[in-house]
């Protein structure tokens, strides 16, 4: 892929521009940097509590617009541009149902810029300390946003505070979503995984251009939350990504999370939906692609709302095998990693969108019904789940709490721990955390029983309390929360610098060894050991073993990793 992107003609033209810069020079009122495709003119920003200005470059194209004949194809190189490109405006969102973002702003007390949507969306944003220039060789951190692979944007995250306080370069990038990012025909004509290939294109752009912004292409850390973390985990597993990054941080998401693979019957159902809505011939892949490429983006969005299997696939290229098999075979990129979860991943935000009635309390009958519906566990095995989670639990509140813990375990904690073990056993340095602090600013927008919910840590990682721009990520942070945020920014940046999050003035974060120590990120940071040991054993060993030995109609051999689950509410994109 890199040969296509490092086109000789583009390099020669870029060299001419560099020579011209020696006589012209940048304007004094805005930062200007060269890229291999042309010049970009950004703007400067400042953050609270720091004297270091930040150069901000928004909407830099890393690939050609995936329009018309490029729809459902690998991304192509971006085209050269003349003059200096304005990089002061946010790029458009990739096509999605933007109503989801609006609802998240209310529940999470955040604010995003007013952004339009477009199929032309393969852009990235860069936040660099103002002193950074060619030769600075600062660590680079590339952020992949979450959103269930259905929603999200690079431009709802502001990297200014992290760049200013920690002297690192932050890149936030976009990728195609939903049907645009994952449609596949099941053959060579459209193998799918376009979103992951977009991410490869962005990382290739970083390798070829980030030094002109002061970054070190040999020190690139990829990080993300939820679907973004799943992307990071997938990139670590993919042979196509080898050499494009050097460290990885996965916040509340890994590639073996159950819902990521849709069964064949659901794919077939979706093809019938496509045929009904668009009138396309679904029996011929070439004709189907030609038909879909001629449809409007609105028509495809309509399909997206009525289907459910636009997910990752083993394509033989990006994923040569199932993620669990790649982990088992130790054929992945063995690099330092941070993996973590929050202590109430399904406390409010995710269940509120799917079954809000459970939040007030539940009984065992309703809880088991929902477990069967959501997890597809056969009825004859539900008693095992009940014994594990509801034994000696009688009140509606106790049952609700156990049910929400169960969801968090299945979709986040257990996959995270299992992945960390595979990385550790492959010889790669691993650091594990559990984030435990519920933001004070959210106490009046969600129930009192909610602890650190899904995505709560993002505002701390990005230093949201120190931002001054039109992206509001952490309004009303307490002084203690600001201190925790500073510590988390330092941990993350130290890891990006050296592959080890530890440093002067920080509580020790032990590596994830056979003793399975992990860091408890709270106002008072401490060390824990063997996170959810019994629950991990139940889902990864006990239940699969009993199901495999049973004479009952066979269920999935490893329910944790092969459940056919599609939760459209999962992986909200917001901080």
From Swiss-Prot:
Gene Ontology MF, one: carboxylesterase activity
GO cellular component: extracellular region
Enzyme Commission code: 3.1.1.1
Gene3D superfamilies named in the record: alpha/beta hydrolase (3.40.50.1820)
S-S bonds: 94-121, 280-291
Listed Pfam families: COesterase
First-listed, main subcellular location of the protein, grouped into a coarse class: secreted
Residues modified by glycosylation: 82, 281, 363, 524
SUPFAM superfamilies: alpha/beta-Hydrolases (SSF53474)
Signal peptide: 1-27
Reaction(s) the record says it catalyses: a carboxylic ester + H2O = an alcohol + a carboxylate + H(+)
Keywords: Disulfide bond, Glycoprotein, Hydrolase, Secreted, Serine esterase, Signal
Subcellular location: Secreted
InterPro entries in the cross-refs: AB_hydrolase_fold (IPR029058), CarbesteraseB (IPR002018), Carboxylesterase_B_AS (IPR019826), Carboxylesterase_B_CS (IPR019819), Type-B_Carboxylest/Lipase (IPR050309)
Active site: 226 (acyl-ester intermediate), 345 (charge relay system), 454 (charge relay system)
Post-translational modification: N-glycosylated.
PANTHER family hit by this protein: CARBOXYLESTERASE
Family: Belongs to the type-B carboxylesterase/lipase family.
Function, as annotated: Involved in the detoxification of xenobiotics and in the activation of ester and amide prodrugs.
Protein name as annotated: Carboxylesterase 5A
Natural source organism: Canis lupus familiaris (Dog)
Gene that this polypeptide is encoded by: CES5A
